[in-house]
């Protein structure tokens, strides 16, 4: 016994032995990560891979440092030549970058081979935040957005104009003599958020400060889960550590649902149910997503399955999904327009276009359904901002879900669980697609420049531009194909209206230098501290 005791005492406490064993375990673990976890891409080139003992682990740890410049450089070197390459990830979840020539191949794969649903759930940690999601409710919401909400946007122009004008006037004032300094991000938020909430949830809460605070609290927690659990935490830790880290998000979600969403949804749903059973009932529901989705769920005939909790949870998650990118893009547009050289007269051209498009008739004005479609130059300026500053550097993301994996057109085989995406920032900066791509050219997407001298034969050709929502394999902020962002029409509508109202009603001093964006985990967000000098115009 004494010999055994001495042995265990030695092995338990000898620092040399402990250090040797620990070092061996660490090296073994790193070797397994290098060879197994980071090997699915085979011989594909990696961004930032350098010779060394653990080149791919090192590349992953440097991934955030490489950032957008590294992704653009890799696209130029590989993607622009039709080659697949690998973007390392600080969470040890490398992603295969798909060149533009093979986007169609990705889109043609069935969802049981390359799944957009599984990719989104992993990237946003939705499997932890929405553990009881119902595919029927998901489908109803998507169909409602496509077939009801999008088709009613122009009809609701007056509603949007009411929210944007009320909130911008309150934020910036109506004093035509005094210049004021205003935070750009906060100003945009005050205009966009209420308008977004009004069409998603309804008029009863869109200006409620307590509702805004609770939604903001949940959105911040959701963002925390997305960054930490969805992007930083290694996949094998998500079921345990990820669930623990998502508990704050779940708590804030449940509190928000019980306080706001479930009572509102229950009231609306059962009023519509009574209306469907008794057409003579005196009830006119407000035109918003709650009404349209409730109608669609009732039309399925499966009322028992339509849980107000499940409905509310899906509705609530749409706000942090839609609001940040819409606010970021509107802020970026303002930064870009105010940063253009004075000799381009961008503000003047946009103001004159808006002034010409506005119909001063009492029943028209900002409520005119035809107003926004007439803003061709502004449409181009917004599209150019989204080209230069897409919120997501990678889009069209998919996850390999086929049991046997999938083989790329180039011949490389990818196992189940591999992530793929398209480097949007690389394509958007490709000189072969967009000449002088590094320059913000607000009227790049028009068929001619404002003030351009025309031949007599061309004067009859109207000024046009490519629509903000038009997705192609060279313009990817919204994705591409049938799974492109279904809410892009709403986002574009709110951005265009907000910027148009601001430029028409307020003088804005130009920036000496554009405020810089911050890139975190592939997401490019505008400076939230930058301010602008504004003064109400005298009309």
Curated annotation (Swiss-Prot):
It is a single-pass membrane protein. CDD domains: CYP503A1-like. Its EC number is 1.-.-.-. Pathway: Secondary metabolite biosynthesis; terpenoid biosynthesis. GO terms for cellular component: membrane. Polytolypin and biosynthesis intermediate compounds show antifungal activity and can efficiently inhibit the growth of the pathogenic funfus Candida albicans. One of its GO terms (molecular function) is oxidoreductase activity, acting on paired donors, with incorporation or reduction of molecular oxygen. It catalyses: 2alpha-hydroxyl, 4beta-carboxyl motiol + 4 reduced [NADPH--hemoprotein reductase] + 4 O2 = polytolypin + 4 oxidized [NADPH--hemoprotein reductase] + 5 H2O + 5 H(+); 4beta-carboxyl motiol + 4 reduced [NADPH--hemoprotein reductase] + 4 O2 = 2-deoxypolytolypin + 4 oxidized [NADPH--hemoprotein reductase] + 5 H2O + 5 H(+). Keywords: Heme, Iron, Membrane, Metal-binding, Monooxygenase, Oxidoreductase, Transmembrane, Transmembrane helix. GO terms for biological process: secondary metabolic process. The chain crosses the membrane at residues 13-33. Signal peptide: none annotated. It holds the Pfam family p450. It is found in: Membrane. Its cofactor is heme. Heme binds at residue 435. It comes from the Eukaryota. Coiled coil: none annotated. Belongs to the cytochrome P450 family. Cytochrome P450 monooxygenase; part of the gene cluster that mediates the biosynthesis of antifungal fernane-type triterpenoid polytolypin. PolE acts as a dual functional P450 monooxygenase which can catalyze the formation of both the 1-beta-hydroxyl group and 10-beta-carboxyl group, however the oxidation sequence of polE has still to be determined. PANTHER family: CYTOCHROME P450, P450, PUTATIVE (EUROFUNG)-RELATED. This is Cytochrome P450 monooxygenase polE. It comes from Polytolypa hystricis (strain UAMH7299). The gene is polE.
